[in-house]
């Protein structure tokens, strides 16, 4: 991936705008049971107003517990709060964004196949996610972590379904500060539309935080000529106050 694209992507993300264009015409047919390659967000124009920061134009249905937590969030989206006043854990402490918030970072990710699991390599902060494909069930009492424990399986030849549980409660669901608890369950349906295009259908469920499942769909484009670069949560990375003006 060309490094001169990174400042532009960063500016879009922290201004609350996604790199959004209408998907181009269909390409060759999707390969069977294969997501390998580097993917970059490419959402349609009607999602432009929100998809860089949250899942839907409408607010999710929050429980009273989550409503109180959400009121405490001081996000930096569109400069509402500055670097000196935000309490966004990613910005203030370099905490991992976790799943699903990692999708709101404006950087690509790569799928790598192995015999026992599918790896997701996110360009942001060297994040590596392991999705087990060896037939194990979704754990009922997992150790808590930033990325949770992910188990995946194929439905047909073009849809890969991932269930993730076991999150700690230190992350936000999105850049706006919607909270979650350790009961969060994230379902992702990765559907290979054709050779060059993929959509992810999200279902977020959390009985402590969400009064109803939160659903959304994001779109991605294959970038066969790109290579993942190095984006670290460092002092240089955090110096984006110019994007908040």
Predicted feature descriptions by range:
Residues 1-10:
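Bacterial N-terminal signal peptides that target proteins for export
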Residues 2, 19-245:
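PEST-like low-complexity, intrinsically disordered acidic/proline/serine-rich tracts
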Residues 15-17:
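N-terminal signal peptide c-region/cleavage motif recognized by signal peptidases
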């Amino acid at each position: 991936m060309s490094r001169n694209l990174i400042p532009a992507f960063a500016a879009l993300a922290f201004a609350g705008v996604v790199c959004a264009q209408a998907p181009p015409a269909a390409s060759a047919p999707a390969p069977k049971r294969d997501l390998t390659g580097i993917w970059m967000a490419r959402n349609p124009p009607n999602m432009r107003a929100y998809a860089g920061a949250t899942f839907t134009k409408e607010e999710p249905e929050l429980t009273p517990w989550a409503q109180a937590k959400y009121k405490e969030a001081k996000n930096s989206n569109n400069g509402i709060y500055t670097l000196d006043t935000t309490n966004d854990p990613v910005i203030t402490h370099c905490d991992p964004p976790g799943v699903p918030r990692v999708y709101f970072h404006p950087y690509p990710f790569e799928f790598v196949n192995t015999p026992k699991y599918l790896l997701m390599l996110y360009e942001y902060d060297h994040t590596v996610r392991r999705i087990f494909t060896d037939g194990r069930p979704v754990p009922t009492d997992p150790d808590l972590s930033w990325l949770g424990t992910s188990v995946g399986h194929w439905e047909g030849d073009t849809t890969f379904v991932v269930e993730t549980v076991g999150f700690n409660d230190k992350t936000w669901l999105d850049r706006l500060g919607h909270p979650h608890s350790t009961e969060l369950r994230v379902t992702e349906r990765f559907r290979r539309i054709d050779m060059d295009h993929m959509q992810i259908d999200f279902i977020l469920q959390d009985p402590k935080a969400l009064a109803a499942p939160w659903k959304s769909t994001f779109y991605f484009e294959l970038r066969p000529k790109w290579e993942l670069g190095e984006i670290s949560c460092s002092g240089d990375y955090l110096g984006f106050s110019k994007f908040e003006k």
